[in-house]
Amino acid sequence: MRAFGLRLRSWTRLLTLGLASATLVAVGGHAQDQIRVASPDGRNRITVELRDGALFYSLQRDGRAVLLPSRLGFEFRGAPPLRDGLRVVDTTRSTVDQSWTQPWGEVARVRDHHNELRLSVAESAPPARRFAVVFRVFNDGVGFRYEFPEQPWLGDFAITEELTEFALADDARAWWIPSNRPRLDRSEMLYSSSPVSVLDSVQTPLTMETRDGRTFIVIHEANLVDYARMNLRGPRMENRTLGAALAPYADGIKVRGRTPFVTPWRTIQLADRATDLVPSVLGLNLNPPNVLPSTDWISPMKYVGIWWGMHIGTMTLSPGPKHGATTANAKRYIDFAAANGIGGVLVEGWNVGWDGDWIRNRNAFSFMQAYPDYDLGEVARYAHEKGVKLIVHNETSGGVENYERQMDSAFALYHSLGLDAVKSGYVTDLTSEGHSHWGQYMVRHYRKVIETAAKYGIMLDVHEPVHATGERRTYPNMMTREGARGQEYNAWGGEGGNPPEHETILFFTRLLAGPMDFTPGIFDILIERGTGRPRRPEEARVRTTLAKQLALYVVLYSPLQMAADLPENYEHQPAFQFIRDVPVDWDTTRVLEGKIGDYVVVARRERNGESWYVGAITDEEGRSFDVPLSFLSPGRRYVAEIYADGPGAHWLTNPLPVAISRRAVTAHSRLRLILAPGGGQAIRIRPAR
């Protein structure tokens, strides 16, 4: 971890010092001096000022206030706070305009164009501790962080509070999930919507829309390394000021460190329309470039797996008559994947440790020893023979010490068997020592797993994770993660499953942080195989139409994308052809229509290809859209393969009908999309042969 931090600081210094446009500006001694930096297009502007020795920043867009003056600083255990009696020593400015290529993603090319302001700050009186605040202002938002140089009076430290504020100028409408539930460090909850002024404590990304609808604001963080995750402490009717709320150690300390030290970036994404929020690259641009010597082994793919059967009760994780992770059953899934062009198979419940209360017995898991009815080596050999990747499952139940003891040996074993993908899990609220699931202790662990996996050539899909903060740029083997309420809640969720609006909110909230392993593709909407009968409306079940399940492959991005249903539920289903065809890696993404909580229409062009895919989803209301196909190449002829809600389709009463049709289209064509209540539409637009 220290080595990575040193590399990061070196990269930051080289970027700042190596630019020809860097200048040094002396700041006078006036207490109210304002220092400003704007985005390259001039629309976003940060203003920094001292008020009675305290440091504040504010944010404007098009001359209108987004954030009012908001405090910066820290409180420590065993040392005075670093918040008052400050002076600005100097400022440094620089500009960057460069582009880089993602090995995979929602877009292939990313432009990094920003103006940077670096303020060196010190206490006016002894011990005169020093720090810097670095602002980078982009056309799509702002990032800022603290940097602590090595110094005599600030060596080892323990942060009890980060005082960073976000003082909203408008009582904007927010879409949020809570962060203050006792012993509940998880993100698998339904979203609520309310004015900022009534928020308590919430998770990020926090997406907001100003009351006049002119600005969308998203607060999050980037490059979370060796620090605690940031949640937001709400105003509770007092005002509209949100404060950083760091996840704690068991003793209440938030962050332990030693100078030199840098914090994560605090990010504020800005857009005129909700549709402009996606694809979100602000956090990616605030992470260091890829450090892997080669990414040739990293391969986005679709996969099937022994997963949904355990949620609906047709299989079990633990050994017994319905054990899902048997050699024979794994081979059955591998055969299905090979026959249908599916890249991978996930097997859960293969390793010793699932007997009894596996959540409490977190140290019982072995990540190398299989149950007697599962031959890991033979399954790996068979998968390789069939051209299918075997995805290994590592559930920890939060026993991270047990996992770290075995990790090198386990990953070396997987590598020796030609296995290059792991799905990990952390089904727990606190660590075995009582630390927060999202605190510095766990952030260090998650980074150690990413780095160790990279060493052994392993891609990662992390469930129960800390939230994504753009680290996939630096370590592109960190493919996808859960971090929100996914499909499994449709099997057993207490509220009857995810409501039809859920995915239309995720697109504009959770997915702004990074890819999500939502696990779409359930065709047995009423879960007859798990129950023995169609489930009733009040019971847990999938609350979409079948066509919407197809559309989710385009709408909810993940480079590892599951076809989650049982293989037998896909047999003799013409609609399964869309899952066979749809890519998981994109060159271009365009959001055509969207309203948070209501609907999304998105078009994506496949990486290294000429086909486009359109996904449209709606909430409980039926909708129609007239979509121009001007994004297609002019002068080319295409065929649109359309998977629409069938006649009479309705998520509650008639979810299964799918109407499949084809029509010739060009860049001058328009498509009329008609979505049933809770429905969707999925379209493949390929060049005409």
Residue ranges and their predicted role:
Residues 119, 565-613, 648-656:
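Glycan-recognition and catalytic regions of carbohydrate-active enzymes
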Residues 34-292:
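N-terminal accessory beta-strand-rich subdomains and adjacent acidic, glycine-rich linkers
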Residues 662-689:
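C-terminal beta-strand-rich structural cap/linker in extracellular carbohydrate-active enzymes
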Residues 596-638, 681-682:
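Carbohydrate-binding surface patches
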Residues 258-340, 344:
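An acidic-aromatic substrate-binding cleft motif
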Residues 2-16:
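Bacterial N-terminal signal peptides that target proteins for export
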Residues 349-541, 545:
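Aromatic- and carboxylate-enriched substrate-binding clefts and catalytic-loop regions
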Residues 14-25:
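Bacterial N-terminal signal peptides
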